Structure formats: C-alpha cells, structure tokens
C-alpha cells in the first residue's frame, strides 16, 4: 500500500526530491501544487517532468481517504465519514464559527481511553493514523469548498476527534508542523488546538517541543473518585500527577490551558463540584479556561443524560464568582450524528446489520 504524499514534511519532501536526483526547487513546486493549488493528482502538476510524475505515482498516492458519508446540519456543521485504505472508518467535522471554519480531526481508529460517556470509545483502538491520513482530512474538507466554488478556507484546527492525540504523539506533532508550515496551508499555531485526556508525561514532552499551539485537557471532574468513575485513564494519571504536568506546561510555555468539562446531569454538574473545580484551578487561574460542554446523549451510555440549562448556568455562575474564566460551548450539528464517534459507530452498526441480512437471504 503506497503512502500518501501528505505524509511528508516539507524537509522530507526536499530530501525525497534530492534522492531522486532532482533539484531542491522541485520539492517546492510539488509542495505548492499540493497545499496552495490543492491538486488531487500528480498529473495536474504541469511544470514537472513526465519522469518525475511517474516517480511520484510509483511511490505515493495523493489522498488515501475515500468519502463514505457527508451529513450537513442546518447550522452549517458538516460531518464526514471517511474510509481508510484498509477499509476502516474515521470521522471529521467542520464547524462554522464566528471567527472562521474550524475542522476537528481524528487521530486514531477507535480509542483505548475508555471514557464512560463517549461514543468514540465504543470501539477499541485498532491503529494510529499516520501523518498523511490526518492531513488528508483537512485537504478533503477544503476540497469540499473548492469544488463548490466557495471562497472559504479552513482557518482553525482542533485535534479532538476519535482517539487520544498524545497516544499517537509523533504523528500528531508531525501533522501540526505540516499544517502550520508557512509555505503550505499556513494555519497559524494559535489557531490549532491539541486535546488530551490527560497523559501527563506527554504533556511535559509537548511543553518542550516549542510549538505555540493551544493545549486542551479533558478534565470532566474535580476530584479523583469522580474522575476515575468517568474516565478510566485517571487510574494511571490521577489529578495530582496531571496537574503537576499542567503546571510544568504553563511554566515552560507561558500559554493558557483550556479544560474541557462535559456536563452530565446529577453526576458532575453540581454547585459543590463547581466550587471544588474552582479550588483545583486556583494556582493557575490566570492561565486557565474552562469550556463547559453540553452532553450529546449516546444510546449505549444511557446512564447519562444532558444537564438542564439551569444546572449548567448555576455551575457557570459559581465558577465565575470564584474567578474562573469559563464559557458554555456553542453546540454544533445537533440535528445530525453529533457526538464524537457517533456517525462512525452508527454506520458500522448498519453495515453489520446489512451483512447479517445478506447472509441469511436464500
């Protein structure tokens, strides 16, 4: 199976071209065709020799993903189901924000973190995505607009889709550097957010990388007992270890950390828990931000329900009174398979049911 050309960084592209006996500027031409002109085949690279195009075709594909399903919401949110070369499925989501077009990318097929409220974890991790497969998600979303003649550009990226980004650390870091490259998509570092469920050692590594992207941490509870019951990962990285890493990150980068907090009715959304969260954040209050997330119900996790608006606002008001910067996240795509992993999970379920019907037919 040939790799995607998107899997190469610009420096790797230069090294590849030189290994083929080509001049360095040929790599710059290929890079421009891919990321500025956004062609979908090597044959469209009209200033390259036939010999070089043949080498590219022999060694790479452009985009390895196949579009299976597109769902468009009334609010402009677009959810994509892509098929990988090995037949596995991933999701990507485009969200229209007041500040631009934001794309949420997937980094793994399935997830091993085991959050008890999440559709992504219903299917265990099967493999990591490589850099090319992650970049391809952005390029296909951009193609969606290019083909419609819409003069719109992906401006923001959130690495919050299926999987734990820091469990696929090297490929995610390579992806960030690829899309941030000023000769390519040139998406600003401060327009890129990487999320983690709390791999403390990787947060420390990330602090030392020198990338100026945003960090978000899925917290979802203010104490160990509750967090462990919601997120299995807390057994390995309890709050004390997690916050030591977060404080190291803030001291090293002087960058703000966003805390994601999903609102589960009568589970983690009480006023006392809001006070506990404010106390937890008191030492990093100036460089922290809490994102309160309305819960999208998942049928397989029917022990949870969405917090009523009055409980959400009481939680929000308590944080505010205690000096915590916070916001209630705007919802997107509520009329489609909105929860992370839901479209993929539902599609796989339908595919299995279809296969069973076909197998029993005479």
Curated annotation (Swiss-Prot):
It comes from Streptococcus gordonii (strain Challis / ATCC 35105 / BCRC 15272 / CH1 / DL1 / V288). GO terms for cellular component: cytoplasm. InterPro entries: Aldolase_TIM (IPR013785), Methyltransferase_A (IPR040072), RlmN_N (IPR048641), RNA_MTrfase_RlmN (IPR027492), rRNA_lsu_MTrfase_RlmN/Cfr (IPR004383), rSAM (IPR007197). S-adenosyl-L-methionine binds at residues 163-164, 195, 218-220, 296. This is Probable dual-specificity RNA methyltransferase RlmN. Binds 1 [4Fe-4S] cluster. The cluster is coordinated with 3 cysteines and an exchangeable S-adenosyl-L-methionine. The active site is at 91 (proton acceptor), 340 (s-methylcysteine intermediate). The gene is rlmN. Its EC number is 2.1.1.192. The keyword Magnesium does not apply. Keywords: 4Fe-4S, Cytoplasm, Disulfide bond, Iron, Iron-sulfur, Metal-binding, Methyltransferase, rRNA processing, S-adenosyl-L-methionine, Transferase, tRNA processing. It is found in: Cytoplasm. GO terms for biological process: rRNA base methylation; tRNA methylation.
């Amino acid at each position: 199976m040939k790799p995607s050309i998107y899997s190469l960084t610009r420096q790797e592209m230069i090294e590849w071209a030189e290994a083929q006996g080509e001049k360095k500027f040929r790599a710059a031409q290929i890079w421009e065709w891919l990321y500025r002109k956004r062609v979908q085949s090597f044959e469209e690279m009209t200033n390259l020799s036939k010999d070089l195009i043949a080498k590219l075709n022999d060694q790479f594909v452009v985009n390895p993903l196949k579009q299976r399903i597109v769902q468009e919401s009334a609010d402009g949110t677009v959810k994509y189901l892509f098929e990988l070369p090995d037949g596995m499925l991933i999701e990507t989501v485009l969200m229209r924000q007041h500040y631009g077009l934001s794309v949420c990318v997937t980094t793994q097929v399935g997830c091993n973190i085991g959050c008890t409220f999440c559709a992504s974890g219903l299917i265990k991790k099967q493999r990591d995505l490589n850099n090319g497969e992650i970049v391809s998600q952005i390029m296909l979303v951009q193609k969606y607009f290019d083909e419609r003649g819409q003069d719109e550009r992906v401006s923001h990226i959130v690495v919050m889709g299926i999987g734990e980004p820091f469990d696929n650390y090297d490929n995610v870091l390579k992806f960030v550097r690829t899309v941030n490259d000023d000769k390519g998509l040139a998406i600003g570092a401060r327009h890129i957010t990487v999320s983690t469920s709390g791999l403390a050692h990787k947060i420390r590594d990330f602090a030392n990388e020198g990338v100026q992207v945003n960090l978000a941490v899925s917290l979802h509870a203010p104490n160990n007992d509750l967090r462990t019951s919601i997120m299995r990962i807390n057994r390995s990285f309890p709050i004390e270890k997690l916050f030591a890493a977060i404080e190291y990150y803030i001291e090293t980068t002087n960058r703000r950390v966003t805390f994601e907090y999903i609102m589960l009715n009568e589970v983690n959304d009480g006023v006392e828990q809001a006070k506990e969260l404010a106390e937890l954040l008191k030492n990093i209050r100036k460089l922290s931000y809490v994102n309160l997330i309305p819960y999208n119900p998942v049928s397989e996790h029917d022990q949870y329900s969405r917090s009523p608006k009055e409980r959400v606002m009481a939680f929000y008001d308590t944080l505010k009174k205690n000096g915590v910067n916070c916001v209630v996240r705007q919802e997107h795509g509520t009329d489609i398979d909105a929860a992370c992993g839901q479209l993929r999970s539902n599609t796989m379920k339908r595919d299995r049911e279809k296969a069973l019907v076909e197998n029993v037919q005479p």
